[in-house]
Swiss-Prot record:
Residues 1-23 form the signal peptide. The active site is at E315 (proton donor). InterPro entries: Chitinase_II/V-like_cat (IPR011583), Chitinase_insertion_sf (IPR029070), ChitinaseA_N (IPR013540), Glyco_hydro18_cat (IPR001223), Glyco_hydro_18_chit_AS (IPR001579), Glycoside_hydrolase_SF (IPR017853), Glycosyl_Hydrlase_18 (IPR050314), Ig-like_fold (IPR013783). It comes from Serratia marcescens. Transmembrane segments: none annotated. This is Chitinase A. One of its GO terms (biological process) is chitin catabolic process.
Length: 563
């Protein structure tokens, strides 16, 4: 055996250790505790004014710090997202910080890597969330169908739509996760308001606190720009799937983003207007105001990327809406111009994003109101016309009673003006393409009490003393409650086969409720197919137990699906 003297051995060992140190990669860094959720569109969870609520950026600002407890720091630090370099800079010692931007939403596995000429050493991965309003950072919201909802495939090529209301998350406790989304092609979010104070949004004053809420939302925002009426319900209220204190988007919008991940083919549209929010439309004969509105809708869609277009619910061009002081013969022309300009804006947005955006509108089914607008011209800008073939009669009139959502006129009043068929015929007579017309169904009833003086056992031929006790508001009863409570006992169910309309009547009190049920919806669906119309939609999804939506799907020819 060869022998080394002690000084030489020490020299060799020292030389070897020095070479190993020079050839080693850096030590392993540790990501420090810190924020792991970032957002491209930032939401202030305490704000009430829209201008303060939302901050839109092109990319999320991400920050990460790290420590090195052992080993060499190397010369370069890198941030890896899902294994790809997102940032690099000098490695300066036992700790470091990187600030960088991420322009695409999602969930990323983030690592810090320290590098030198001999290699890189990466930290353990930490998940970060980069939130964007397309919902790409969220797990799909796919919940079991509730109540009587059965699964259907959307394979008929027809529209199956329904409205979901912002305020439904309160007393109704109807949240987005309860929507039977697989049974819909279109979900309309009611309602998006248009900013404006006294003289512009006076109809809102009939609902306690609603006008004041809009003024808070629109603080510092120009009149005739869109906003969010209730930021808490829309973005700040914890809901299933968006419950953490640091979730960037909560509320209805947060859940709708997740719903879109589960049902990417579902078209989700913000509906602007509605009965008490239509006043600003009457001022849009002024092009400056109209341009400001259209521009703000574009900004809204750019901000809230889960939306697929816009629905305009102007009630009603020409007047006879909530505000009796509003309405002009020029409204029809304004409506056509508004549709044309919205379409041009949406086409421009499509060119920028590569997405297709729909333009729809909810309109009255009364011929008197239809004739105020050249829908044969407006249709060229529109994807669908949602014909509100409901609210024909109700306790707003105690002397003239009738079916609120009938397909045809009843035998006892064959000259009834307000029917679904008459509304459709008025549009077709103008030259509107049948496929553009989507017929409305009611997931609620309207009713009276004290009905008396009627003839031939037909309560509609009498008069009433007031509105029937309602589910949430007197005069209006959810279909769910009608089906569950008013189909037996003293209540008498009758189906008017001529009108294709059901009603229930309680002779002892004179309570009378007119509504849609599975049979009347089946008749509407058959009519849609016979006339080659666009489909069916409903107001409003929280009031149904599944019977109405099931019938909408079945009557249009959608086949049974699986959950």
């Amino acid at each position: 055996m060869r022998k080394f003297n002690k000084p030489l051995l020490a020299l060799l060992i020292g030389s070897t250790l020095c070479s190993a140190a020079q050839a080693a990669a850096p030590g392993k860094p540790t990501i420090a505790w810190g924020n792991t959720k970032f957002a491209i569109v930032e939401v202030d969870q305490a704000a009430t004014a829209y201008n303060n609520l939302v901050k839109v950026k092109n990319a999320a600002d991400v920050s990460v710090s790290w420590n090195l407890w052992n080993g060499d720091a190397g010369t370069t630090a890198k941030i890896l997202l899902n294994g790809k370099e997102a940032w690099s800079g000098p490695s300066t010692g036992s700790s470091g910080t990187a600030n960088f931007k991420v322009n695409k939403g999602g969930r990323y596995q983030m690592q810090v890597a320290l590098c030198n000429a001999d290699g890189c050493t990466a930290s353990d991965a930490t998940e970060i969330v980069v939130a964007d309003t397309d919902g790409s950072h969220l797990a799909p919201l796919k919940e079991p169908l509730l109540e009587k909802n059965k699964p259907y495939k959307q394979n008929s090529g027809k529209v199956v739509g329904s409205y979901f209301v912002e305020w439904g998350v309160y007393g109704r406790n109807f949240t987005v996760d309860k929507i039977p989304a697989q049974n819909l092609t279109h979900l309309l979010y009611g309602f998006i308001p248009i900013c404006g104070g006294n003289g512009i949004n006076d109809s809102l004053k009939e609902i306690e606190g609603s006008f004041q809420a809009l003024q808070r939302s629109c603080q510092g925002r120009e009149d005739f720009k869109v906003s969010i009426h209730d930021p808490f319900a829309a973005l700040q209220k914890a809901q299933k799937g968006v419950t953490a204190w640091d979730d960037p988007y909560k509320g209805n919008f947060g859940q709708l983003m997740a719903l879109k991940q589960a049902h990417p083919d579902l078209k989700i549209l913000p509906s602007i207007g509605g009965w008490t929010l239509s006043d600003p439309f009457f001022f849009m004969g002024d092009k400056v105001k109209r341009d400001r509105f259209v521009g703000s809708v574009k900004e809204f869609l750019q901000t809230w990327k889960f939306f697929d277009g816009v629905d305009i619910d102007w009630e009603f061009p020409g007047g006879k809406g909530a505000n009796p002081n509003l309405g002009s013969p020029q409204d029809g022309e304004t409506y056509v111009l508004l549709m044309k300009e919205l379409r041009a804006m949406l086409d421009q947005l499509s060119a920028e994003t590569g997405r297709k955006y729909e333009l729809t509108s909810a309109i009255s089914a009364g011929k008197d109101k239809i004739d105020k607008v050249a829908y044969n011209v407006a249709q060229n800008s529109m994807d669908h016309i949602f014909l509100m073939s409901y609210d024909f009669y109700g306790p707003f009139d105690l002397k003239n009673l009738g079916h609120q959502t009938a397909l045809n006129a009843p035998a006892w009043k064959p000259d009834t003006a307000y029917t679904t068929v008459n509304g459709v015929n008025a549009l077709l007579a103008q030259g509107v393409k049948p496929g553009k017309v989507v017929v409305g169904t009611a997931m609620y009833g309207r009713g009276w009490t004290g009905v008396n003086g009627y003839q031939n056992n037909i309560p509609f031929t009498g008069t009433a003393t007031g509105p029937v006790k309602g589910t949430w508001k007197n005069g209006i009863v959810d279909y769910r409650q009608i089906a569950g409570q008013f189909m037996s006992g003293e209540w008498q169910y009758t189906y008017d086969a001529t009108a294709e309309a059901p009603y229930v009547f309680k002779p002892s009190t004179g309570d009378l409720i007119t509504f849609d049920d599975a049979r009347s919806v089946q008749a509407k669906g058959k009519y849609v197919l016979d006339k080659q119309l666009g489909g069916l939609f409903s107001w409003e999804i929280d009031a149904d137990n599944g019977d109405i939506l099931n019938s909408m799907n079945a009557s249009l020819g959608n086949s049974a699906g699986v959950q």
